[in-house]
């Protein structure tokens, strides 16, 4: 809950801004925001050294990590104060308090996310000298960006046969996250479970129980499905999941703002402002991850076939070969009545996918509203950028849930 104060001037119109930046939970954070005068984007960066803490001269007993502030684009450090802008990497900023010099977004939004109710239930947070970590209380975990980097690096090194190097990064991933270092697939599975959170982990158990039932009901067909996955799809499927994690990391600063809200399935507050808005980088994220998910849900379709008393590759009206050629927007239809699979597919929106995949989306000037057309030529639709970020996070959670399913089948952990 530490806020640092910096002054910068816009590189386009020289308007001064006073930035009140909340220190987040990663070793660095970037914010891209519009100038209050000309509207052109400015970007700044804050590096945080959690290994080096300094004291406050006017607050005896309080410490904060040392930081390094730098400008990234279209602004420079200045001495004069300007319009106050509150920026927070982890929590949304309430619109009415965007320019309030006394506002603490983390406290305000943590209350919305139920942090204080959890404090009452978790007295350990007040024991001894333990620090109250609001971000962890509401479902986050520290150094998420760095942990994503370690996971992606280990995965990439493994794919190129650099096992010794991969193990080094798996060790880094495990530090302060797992009880010990684990092999790659176990690490991916455990990280994915942490990433999606407790509520979705419970939904994940229900899905895995369905898979266990399919295996018990017809083990021959279950292992035929597993063989089909291993022989025809495993490399492509896992590569797509790696790409999804990589895309998430590339757009981390924007996506993290809605991570907690999506993780808790919270309704987005209407009176909020974003602390980073790099829409150009993110406009194709939804479409890409939609493609990844719908290319892999044949596994759930196969499990549904077995549970329905059929061979894994036989649907009510087609076989698997035909199924793999139908429009991806329709690939969840064969199991639409098996609601235990809904958590993986209910976030799929083919209209938004078409617009995102074809780049047919535009963030309106001086606005938080995205307008888009399906396929670039369909009816005009609109969505707030905040809601778009929430949907992108929900898609990432769905991808992680599907990845867990694939790993459980791949490793024969069912």
Language model region names:
Residues 1-276:
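Extended intrinsically disordered or low-complexity regions, especially N/C-terminal cytosolic tails and loops
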Residues 5-7, 282-346, 360:
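Flexible secondary-structure boundary motifs
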Residues 12, 37, 43, 51, ...:
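Amphipathic, Lys/Arg-enriched alpha-helical patches that create a basic surface
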Residues 14, 357-361, 374-376:
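Short, flexible loop/turn elements at secondary-structure junctions
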Residues 237, 274-288, 387:
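Non-transmembrane, amphipathic alpha-helical segments
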Residues 268-277, 327-338, 375-379:
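Short, charged/polar, low-complexity loop and linker segments
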Residues 326-337, 351-352, 366-370, 381-385:
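Functional cleft and adjacent loop/helix regions within the main domain
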Residues 341-370:
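Histidine-centered, metal-coordinating catalytic motifs and their short helical/loop contexts
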């Amino acid at each position: 809950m530490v806020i640092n104060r910096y002054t910068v001037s816009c590189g386009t119109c020289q308007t001064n801004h006073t930035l009140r930046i909340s220190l987040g939970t990663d070793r660095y954070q970037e914010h891209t925001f519009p100038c209050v005068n000309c509207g052109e984007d400015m970007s700044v960066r804050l590096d945080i050294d959690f290994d080096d803490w300094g004291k406050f001269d006017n607050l005896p007993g309080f410490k904060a990590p040392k930081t390094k502030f730098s400008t990234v684009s279209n602004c420079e450090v200045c001495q004069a104060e300007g319009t106050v802008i509150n920026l927070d990497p982890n929590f949304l900023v309430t619109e009415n308090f965007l320019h309030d010099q006394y506002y603490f977004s983390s406290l305000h939004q943590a209350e919305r996310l139920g942090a204080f109710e959890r404090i009452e239930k978790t007295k350990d947070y007040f024991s001894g000298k333990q620090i109250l970590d609001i971000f962890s209380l509401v479902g986050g975990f520290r150094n998420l960006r760095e942990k994503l980097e370690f996971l992606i690096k280990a995965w990439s090194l493994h794919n190129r046969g650099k096992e010794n190097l991969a193990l080094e990064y798996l060790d880094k991933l495990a530090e302060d996250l797992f009880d010990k270092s684990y092999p790659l697939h176990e690490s991916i599975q455990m990280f994915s479970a942490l990433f999606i959170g407790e509520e979705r982990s419970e939904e994940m158990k229900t899905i895995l129980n369905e898979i266990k039932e399919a295996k018990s009901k017809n083990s021959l067909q279950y292992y035929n499905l597993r063989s089909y996955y291993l022989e025809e799809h495993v490399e492509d499927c896992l590569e797509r999941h790696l790409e999804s994690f990589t895309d998430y990391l590339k757009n981390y600063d924007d996506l993290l703002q809605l991570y907690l809200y999506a993780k808790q399935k919270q309704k987005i507050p209407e009176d909020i402002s974003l602390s980073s808005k790099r829409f150009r980088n993110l406009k194709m994220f939804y479409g890409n991850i939609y493609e990844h998910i719908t290319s892999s849900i044949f596994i759930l379709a196969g499990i549904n076939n077995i549970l329905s008393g059929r061979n894994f590759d036989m649907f009510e009206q087609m076989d698997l070969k035909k199924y793999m050629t139908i429009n991806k927007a329709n690939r969840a239809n064969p199991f639409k009545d098996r609601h235990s699979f809904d958590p993986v597919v209910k976030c799929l929106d083919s209209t938004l996918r078409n617009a995102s995949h074809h780049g047919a989306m535009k963030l309106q000037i001086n606005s938080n509203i995205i307008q888009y057309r399906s396929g670039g030529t369909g009816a005009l639709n609109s969505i707030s950028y905040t809601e778009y970020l929430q949907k992108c996070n929900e898609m990432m959670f769905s991808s992680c849930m599907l990845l867990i399913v694939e790993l459980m089948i791949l490793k024969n952990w069912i």
